[in-house]
Amino acid sequence: MSLEFTLRKHGIDPHKDLKLIQNIDFANVASAFGSGTGDYVQLFEPQASIFEKEGRGRVVASIGVESGELPYTVYMAKQSYLNTNSEAAQKFTNAVYRAQQWIATHSPEQIAEAITPYFKDTDLAVLTSSIKRYKEQSTYALNPMIEEKEWKNLQDVMTSAGELKSPVVLDKLVNPSFAQQAISSNSTGNTEPPVKKSTTESTDAGVGAGGSS
């Protein structure tokens, strides 16, 4: 959806002005492009940097930057779970915020070293350049809050793609109390259960905006 939104933003109709290939499984997109399918491809890091290093492609634009700030990655839970496991949810959100702060205050080299065990098949230099690109693009959220403007932008993207029939207010699906508590306590171990403002079966989104390259 964000790709289509970006194309429309630049006056390109994704269904008339080009052939948009959408029948390839996500896990096989990179290999399909590497085998000659398509002229452009939307990839996440570190795959984009791997292709550049191998001379199989070059990053020409960031869809994350072009589409604007979005709550691209979130954590969700049913209200029923939050009602009975608020302490666990708070500790989890605290950890997310502390990780976000750590990323914001450390270099791409330091971050790459820390996450290397999760990318055992990726060269450290490639991993570092991937993180550097994301940091330069402000891809990483600085806190777990989802702001109104980011929520509206997400709905604009979904509406443009025909996936959203009518707007949804932020507080209908997002419970910000856990993120607010994490920020206010600076994640120092305060796990006081946040006050619930709703008993409806809604979801809690725990990570704020982050684009993609």
Report each predicted region and the residues it spans.
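Conserved C-terminal helix/tail region of periplasmic/extracytoplasmic solute-binding proteins
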Residues: 155-213
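Short linear loop/turn motifs
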Residues: 19-21, 129-135, 169-181
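Residue-level detector of family-conserved "landmark" positions at structurally sensitive sites
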Residues: 17, 61-62, 126, 145, ...
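Alpha-helical structural context
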Residues: 9-10, 54, 118, 161
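Residue-level detector of short coil/turn "hinge" positions at structural boundaries
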Residues: 14, 58, 165-166
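Bilobed "Venus flytrap"/periplasmic-binding protein-like clamshell domains
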Residues: 1-53, 148-153
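Pocket-lining segment of extracytoplasmic ligand-binding domains
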Residues: 26-119
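Secondary-structure end/capping motifs
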Residues: 83-165
